């Protein structure tokens, strides 16, 4: 395991929820999944009020350009590794237990070694900032202690039935680090841009941590019906609002 601040030496156990994709390579097909922008479900129990709040979120300039920033950074990575071209799909919604994210899917073709692809897609801009290299320098300069596993590079390497190399690498977020002494640490962050509101971003980090904390019984479980949220993600007005983002 290698982290943003180098190798991690403290013995810990990592427990977590399903992780968002950073990059995958299968048969030369490359996928990246830039994610940014967070709609908190808490406080939106009425279906109509929830829909209206989501539509306002999708039209929010700050949320739009926050995702664009991450997409732009990962597109630069894709342009470097995908010598056979690619495409951008989305935006889409990614419903979670306590929140809903906005995301794109980037797809392309490469002939490069999967290990090179992994190296050149470290680290996800949504957990470092942009440009990634400069952001990592600032993290090293201003953060007094390491982030542990949070935002680290994790990968599963293998081969497909035809013997071709494969790789799947997620963002290590929404996890809990548990030490041998039983201490538990959950890390969450938010993407800051010019129009960010400090109080809103703090509430966002609490919502992000809520999923893993509720799994441990440390905070109440989400009360929102997951089927209702999935249906909202397919709502025509919501789909139109998502599509209109690409007209900017």
Where do the protein language model's features map onto the residues?
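Short secondary-structure boundary micro-motifs
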Residues: 5-8, 51-54, 138-139, 159-162
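General beta-strand structural signal in soluble alpha/beta enzymes
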Residues: 3-6, 16, 32-34, 69-71, ...
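Conserved hydrophobic core element of enzyme catalytic domains
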Residues: 20-21, 28, 104-246
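Generic amphipathic alpha-helical segments used as scaffolds and interaction surfaces in large
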Residues: 10, 17, 61, 65, ...
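Cytosolic ligand/metal-binding cores
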Residues: 24-99, 179-232
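Generic recognition of flexible, low-complexity loop/linker segments
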Residues: 10-12, 20, 55-59, 65-66, ...
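Active-site pocket-lining segments that scaffold enzyme catalytic pockets across diverse folds
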Residues: 1-21, 67, 74, 81, ...
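A short linear-motif detector with a strong N-terminal bias
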Residues: 1-3, 10-12, 47-49, 128-129, ...
């Amino acid at each position: 395991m290698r982290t943003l601040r180098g190798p991690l030496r403290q013995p810990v156990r990592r427990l977590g929820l399903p992780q968002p994709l950073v990059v995958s390579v299968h048969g030369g097909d490359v996928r990246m999944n830039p994610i940014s922008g967070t709609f908190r479900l808490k406080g939106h129990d009425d279906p109509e009020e929830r829909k209206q709040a989501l539509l306002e979120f999708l039209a929010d300039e700050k949320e739009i350009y926050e995702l664009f920033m991450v997409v732009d950074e990962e597109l630069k990575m894709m342009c470097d590794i995908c010598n056979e071209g690619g495409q951008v799909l989305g935006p889409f919604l990614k419903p979670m237990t306590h929140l809903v994210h906005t995301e794109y899917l980037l797809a392309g073709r490469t002939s490069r070694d999967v290990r090179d692809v992994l190296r050149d897609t470290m680290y996800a801009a949504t957990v470092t900032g942009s440009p990634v290299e400069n952001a990592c320098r600032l993290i090293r300069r201003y953060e007094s202690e390491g982030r542990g596993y949070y935002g680290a590079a994790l990968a599963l390497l293998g081969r497909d039935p035809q013997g071709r190399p494969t790789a799947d690498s997620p963002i290590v977020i929404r996890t809990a680090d548990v030490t041998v002494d039983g201490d538990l640490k959950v890390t969450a962050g938010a993407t800051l841009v010019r129009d960010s509101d400090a109080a809103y971003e703090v509430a966002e980090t609490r919502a992000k941590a809520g999923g893993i904390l509720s799994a441990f019984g440390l905070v109440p479980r989400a009360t929102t019906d997951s089927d209702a949220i999935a249906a909202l993600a397919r709502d025509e007005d919501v789909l139109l609002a998502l599509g209109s983002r690409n007209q900017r």
